[in-house]
Amino acid sequence: MKKLLLFMCIGCSVLWQANAQVKDLIASGQTINTAGKASTTFLDLQQSLNWLEQEFQVSIAYQDEIVKAKKTRAKMDSFESVEQALTVLLQGTGLKYDKAGERFYIISQKKPSQVPSLNSQETVLVNSFPASNKINGGSTFSGIENAKVEKRRIEIGGRITDENGSGFPGVNILLKGTTTGAVSDAQGNYVINVENENSVLVFSFVGYVDQEIVVGNQSVINVQMEVDESNLEEVVVTALGIEKSAKSLGYATSTVHSDELSINRTPNVMNALQGKVAGVSISALGSGPGGTSKIRIRGQSSISGQNNPLIVVNGVPIDNTNFGSNPGNNASDSSIGVRGGGNTSDGGDGLSSINPDDVETMTILKGAAAAALYGSRAKDGVIMITTKSKNDSKGIGVTYNLNYTNEAPLDFTDYQYEYGQGEQGVRPTTPNPTSGQWSFGEKFQPGMTQVLFDGVTVPYEPVRGIINGFFRNGQNLTNSITLATSSDKGGMSLSFSDLNSKGIVPNNTYNRKTINLGFAYNLSPKFSFRGNFNYSHEDNENPPNIGQQDNTIPVALYNMANSMPLDVLRENRYDENGNEAVYSRFRNRTNPYFTLSDQFQNIKRDRIFGNIALKYYLTDWLFVQGRVGQDYWSRDQDYNNFPTGQASRAPAPAGFVNGVYTQEQRRFREINTDFLINANKKFGELGVNVNFGGNHMQRRSDLNSVQVTDFVVRDLYTVQNGRAKDPIYDLNERAVNSLYGSAELSFQDKFFLTGTVRNDWFSTLSKENRSILYPSVSASWVFHENLNTTGWLNFGKIRAAYAEVGSDADVGAYSNVLFYGINNNLFGGQPVGGPNGTNLPNPNLRPMRIGEAEIGFELSMFQSRVSLDMALYRKLTTDQIVSAQISDASGFVNTSINSGKSENKGVEMLLTVVPVETKDFTWEA
């Protein structure tokens, strides 16, 4: 019996002890071995929390000692939200979490120490940690431990708020010169004991300015933290849509955000950048709300070809064809004119279909090194546009914008008003010598008269304000509404906008409707997708003529005699036969009011572009991405180049009525498919970031056009009404295959070295010359942390770069290929086949090459109130593709050769000063 009682006592003791050990093991997260089963593998809790921070882009604050040695066995790829992950990870650990902000969480023990009241004079528990130890990475607390200390004579408390006045959790409060400190709670409250009135409290948080406050006779100290803009890690969207830290870039870039674009809203989003970016020239052609923006980055690189930068939206290139700059029939060219010669109008460009309110950021990659990963298409720089994909804050938001602008014609003329209309010192006294253009007549005298082209005698006196008298004030009215959502998993943005414009030319109107959808979601911690789709419809009626062209409104007005009354031209634009009344002996000057009423051009364009990208993280430092994007537009237009009855046209044959009418249908499609593999890992103070990818670009464009003349019925502009018809069908296809890669090495997050390489294979060149390889190398050094500048220098960086790119952009899809067609000219009554075109193919034609070197530096001073960005660059373009005339005996007229060479060099400087900056007002110059 005694033995039985002894065994029972021993057994109970063992069971009780085992039970206690099991509880301790569960609380600590350690494994328990059971008979017949293998031990379970647990993950370190602190590593799991670090992974959550990176995956969900949140901050999780905790004391190291409370998570030290704790384990978890949860599968890290199975969480759909931060809250779900923390709930699972903290099970059985004796810890809990509190959500202290939008993306901020605090982990603490379930039974926290009692917090003393402000009036308590008893011994209290305070946090003690080294004075040099701050929050690591903006989230975790290191070296904080609870220690029992002696009674303090003064007890201080208060509330800490952020820049918006909200409670700020996780702020370090340190008693200067000691290891005594505290941390603000979820509401921003804190309590700390100090030694005397001379004690100094230091309030600190990563990304915010440290504040030191002398206690004095205060018992409550409230503090508002200020953002340290000098330490903000600016992220820049670079080539291929890769996001990189701005300080790591060894080349010049400029980024403009949506709030800067909205200050000066313009129908064409690029015009809002005028004067904002150094080294970039942006000029509107003054051709109305649907007009083209001429963009040049660091000058011209091609002598005879196109010099437009590549436009990239959300990582995928889109077409930016300019309609109206130069005549041509190739829809894949950078600029397209109208058939019939002369009277070219500005029909807009690809950027005009983008609603400025949909743009989140615009980044300009200026040099060859910045754009090298885009290869041949980026020889003139790249403009990266990122559109909105979610709400700014969590939840659902609706934004409505109403924008109105007024445009007035710019009258920069400075005419003389001493002598009037006429020639050789004689004013018009009969209709015949009326010049209508020259003001070389007699000197103005009171009571003098002149005879105009209509035979009417009017006063011989100055006519002022011709420009403002003819043109009107333009108006632009934009209504846009956006529905956006945002959550822990992602968000979306859906917008609709309607732009109605009236140009300064009385018969010019423009309407644009756009729908934009952007979205980005994390399906799991490892798998995410994002996409963007944009649809636009444009109606452009009678876009103004551009340039120095005969028979156009601008030329007629600016060359008009200074005593020609506008009302006479308006009321007498037709003669007795219904033709234009000749007001000038110069036949290339058309009455501007005749042009308004009898010449027309109608343009309709529908466009849809977008892309979708899928990204999967194989590990926390390695991901793969696949993306496909498409840009498609259709453009229909009809116009009459020379209205029937125009005085500048030769007399029509008997039975015919003169004039030219054209109908055109253009279709364009470009598909880009690419993949990208990225590895980004740190080895102590050394960081490695490697990218490898490839792209396939396929482009197709076609043109259906018919031009008719010799109308049966005058002023009836239809294809059926023209006796002579000239149809055209033009098809262009081209493709480029590419492989590319980049590698970046960083040391101490201060020294950066980056190299890139890309190889393109062009379909437009011969097999021997279609492959071209172009490299780039860049370096930067962030030096301000190594200098003792007593706080006046917030940021300093030196950078240098060199790159080479090539291009086949000046080679037409088939201009270097011999092909045959059926000629319109008949021989013996039969159509004849033969070589199509007058350009002799050159099998040795090579892509043009551009080598560019640049050095520069960036400075930010006095709490970012003064910033300076300077760059020096030299760009050498060789093997330019030009057209050379050859002997007619060859059967051709010209051939393309590599001959041209040009050099661009310059200095760029952007100085930004913020003289006044308050909570409600900022003045930046």
Pin down the residues of each PLM region.
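Surface-exposed acidic, glycine/proline-enriched linker/cap segments
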Residues: 328-349, 460, 562-576, 718-728, ...
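Flexible hinge/switch segments at interdomain interfaces of large molecular machines
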Residues: 242-249, 454-461, 585-589, 646-648, ...
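Extracellular/periplasmic, surface-exposed regions of secreted and cell-surface proteins
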Residues: 308, 512, 518-527, 532-537, ...
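Short secondary-structure boundary/capping segments
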Residues: 1-2, 327-328, 379, 415-417, ...
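Short, surface-exposed recognition loops and adjoining beta-strand edges that mediate ligand/DNA contacts
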Residues: 284, 292-295, 545, 785-797
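A surface-exposed, glycine/aromatic-enriched loop/edge motif typical of exported proteins
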Residues: 413-447, 536-582, 639, 796-825, ...
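Short, small/polar-rich motifs associated with maturation and membrane association
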Residues: 1-516, 521-523, 528-530, 609
